[in-house]
UniProtKB/Swiss-Prot annotation:
GO terms for cellular component: cytosolic large ribosomal subunit. HAMAP family: Ribosomal_bL19 (MF_00402). InterPro entries: Ribosomal_bL19 (IPR001857), Ribosomal_bL19_CS (IPR018257), Ribosomal_bL19_sf (IPR038657), Translation_prot_SH3-like_sf (IPR008991). This protein is located at the 30S-50S ribosomal subunit interface and may play a role in the structure and function of the aminoacyl-tRNA binding site. Pfam families: Ribosomal_L19. It comes from the Bacteria. Belongs to the bacterial ribosomal protein bL19 family. GO terms for biological process: translation. This is Large ribosomal subunit protein bL19. The gene is rplS. Keywords: Ribonucleoprotein, Ribosomal protein. One of its GO terms (molecular function) is structural constituent of ribosome.
Amino acid sequence: MLDIIKQIESQYIRTDLPNFNIGDTVKVHVRIKEGNRQRVQVFEGIVLKRQNGGVRETFTVRRVAYGVGVERTFPVNAPIIEKIQVVRRGKVRRAKLYYLRDRVGKAAKVKEILK
């Protein structure tokens, strides 16, 4: 039974997206439909968490816009995501970065992995 589910789900898993981890700064290009028009909106921020796996995998991106923290959760395999760009690789020691919600300014920064 599980093999059948995995086989069906494998058809919907996207392979065109880059590998990104928690703590990375990413630009998510989201397709938005307004009436009969479509446009692409870019949401840039730090990846706070990744949840689940397979087709149901989601990730949450946080940014501070005009002094207000904004978090958006995206399904990884959703067709509304046009592309994901990794801007910076972050070095973190946690799987969930909820502590960044309480931090302001430089304290909310994540160390960058230098190549």
